[in-house]
């Protein structure tokens, strides 16, 4: 059995903690034979290979008496880069418990569990459903809507450095004025409505008008303004911080993606530029 979970790009500008899209980088978990103790074979650096791994600890939160197995974990989702690496592991852990214990969890069940573990649905929701997901988490209740993302390419600049979510949240204000909250929510409303309508031009303007988090976080990602200005020269719809950063994501027409990637590569930033697409399947079990 193999469990595959996509990477995710959250917030998409003003959709703070509530909007995310699944993209084409993947975590895979291969389930091998039963064992006396949990063991995860991986080449992902200094992460646990036993029940202290987030994958296993999540699965055991769902079902505490699971039969241990030998597993193989592989991932091309960069760690601590704003592409949902931890969320993908949480979703995989829930699916592992679901399969091994035959729990018959619905996708909504999985989302409820994942959101309680993660604290917000913006990454775990698209990792489960695929596509674009808008979700809320209020009073421990999750509400979500899934739709297809308008046709475009995602050009991701992934810096060589990590940025922990805790550090990125640390620069945010504790509150907004009523006036700013109204303005920020109106921008978010237009962004989501335009994405649902398939209008990337209007969506792009609203995405780049975010007032919730990017103005505070962009000082932590020195490449952000440079890439945003460069992308505008190539007809990009919008550039935004993916999740808590530091990945800088640009939405661009498909026929401009390669040219933009080449341009970003050409300015000598320390990182990797990738062209990604929307993953429409979410978590998959083979």
Curated annotation (Swiss-Prot):
Disulfide bonds: none annotated. Pathway: Amino-acid biosynthesis; L-threonine biosynthesis; L-threonine from L-aspartate: step 4/5. It is found in: Cytoplasm. Its EC number is 2.7.1.39. InterPro entries: GHMP_kinase_C_dom, GHMP_kinase_C_sf, GHMP_kinase_N_dom, GHMP_knse_ATP-bd_CS, Homoserine_kinase, Ribosomal_Su5_D2-typ_SF, Ribsml_uS5_D2-typ_fold_subgr. GO terms for molecular function: ATP binding; homoserine kinase activity. Its main location: cytoplasm. It is an enzyme of class 2 (transferase). It catalyses: L-homoserine + ATP = O-phospho-L-homoserine + ADP + H(+). The keyword Kinase applies. GO terms for biological process: threonine biosynthetic process. It comes from the Bacteria. ATP binds at residues 78-88. Keywords: Amino-acid biosynthesis, ATP-binding, Cytoplasm, Kinase, Nucleotide-binding, Threonine biosynthesis, Transferase. One of its GO terms (cellular component) is cytoplasm. Belongs to the GHMP kinase family. Homoserine kinase subfamily. Catalyzes the ATP-dependent phosphorylation of L-homoserine to L-homoserine phosphate. This is Homoserine kinase. The lineage of its organism: Bacteria, Bacillati, Bacillota, Bacilli, Lactobacillales.
